Amino acid sequence: MGRKKIQISRILDQRNRQVTFTKRKFGLMKKAYELSVLCDCDIALIIFNSAQRLFQYASSDMDRVLLKYTEYSEPHESRTNADILQTLKRRGVGLDGPELDMEEGPEGPGEKLLRTLGGDRGSASPRPRIYPVAPAMSVSELSYRVPPATPGCDPGGLGEVPSVHSRPAYFRPPGLGHPIFSPSHLASKTPPPLYLATDGRRPDLPPGLVGARGGLGTSRSLYSGLQSPGAPGPALGSFAFLPSGSTDCSPGDAAQGPLQPSPWPPTRDAVDPARPVARSLCKEGPPSRGASPPTPPVSIKSERLSPVTGTSGDFPRSFPYPLLLARPLAEPLRPSASLHRLTPDSWPR
């Protein structure tokens, strides 16, 4: 329960007046003690009651404080009951209101209202919530996200190299997919011969391209088995495509299987013969400048090479266009005129 409000006027009852004097006198001395300790000041209280009895309080020594008082001659603050009443009226508090702690400087009713509202608003108003902002995604991440490529050959995976305008698939389980091209494409497209030096021998490859050379040997045996239409051979779709920079492809990674017709409709490559289709079996990174020209991956071009008179007898007549040379690997290959027809524009990039 709060303190009972009383009217600030002379108490007529003698007993009540005596009790109130005793309590408030001690309260006044207690406040003087707190002020002297907290603010390091000298305080002297001199009180005479209605019966003219003296009550005094001094923070240190009354005589010393009174001596300082009599010797002090500078202007100082001096208050009376009239000054206190005027200050209370200016603050909007009557004499019958609750006790008010006197603060430094006068405070009007508007200032007190703002201070009260500010204290209530600071304790009751909730703090503004700050929500974390998601990091902005780049345009490439918004369009699609490509999972990281797994290094090494995947014997059961089938697929083809995506073009620039195609969207890569999110996930392709191993063993499922589509063949590289249908049998109808084999009859209409001719693979370009492997890159050979002018003297008819294979060029010396850098140490980083040894794995790709082994992959090309695998493609030789692959195409030699597909010379005749009736002879079965390893399926072209059994060779999975490697990510750039991987050299783990070897002849033992190829799986055996027949060619399957493609369930997809013919792409734009079958309609437009002037657009090359770049499909690689083992792909290496871009060659460094100043090094010898690397061996290009085996690819299928839509451009038909003109028949060469010197090499027409090396292939059977049953198949219209040769896929690869049928001679064994130990026998040196003869340079043909088709090597001079390869231009840098036809190399896959």
From Swiss-Prot:
CDD domains linked: MADS_MEF2_like
GO CC, any one term: nucleus
Tissue-specificity statement: Highest expression found in embryonic heart and skeletal muscle. Low levels found in adult spleen, lung and testis while no expression is found in adult heart, brain or skeletal muscle.
Compartments, as annotated in UniProt: Nucleus
Disulfide feature: none
UniProt cross-references to SUPFAM superfamilies, sorted A to Z: SRF-like
Region (Disordered): 237-317, 330-349
GO molecular function annotation: DNA-binding transcription activator activity, RNA polymerase II-specific; DNA-binding transcription factor activity; histone deacetylase binding; protein dimerization activity; RNA polymerase II cis-regulatory region sequence-specific DNA binding
Name recorded for this polypeptide: Myocyte-specific enhancer factor 2B
Annotated gene: Mef2b
Classification via InterPro entries: MEF2-like_N, TF_MADSbox, TF_MADSbox_sf
Location (main, coarse): nucleus
Lineage: Eukaryota, Metazoa, Chordata, Craniata, Vertebrata
Protein's job: Transcriptional activator which binds specifically to the MEF2 element, 5'-YTA[AT](4)TAR-3', found in numerous muscle-specific genes. Activates transcription via this element. May be involved in muscle-specific and/or growth factor-related transcription.
Subunit relationships: Heterodimer. Interacts with HDAC9. Interacts with HDAC7.
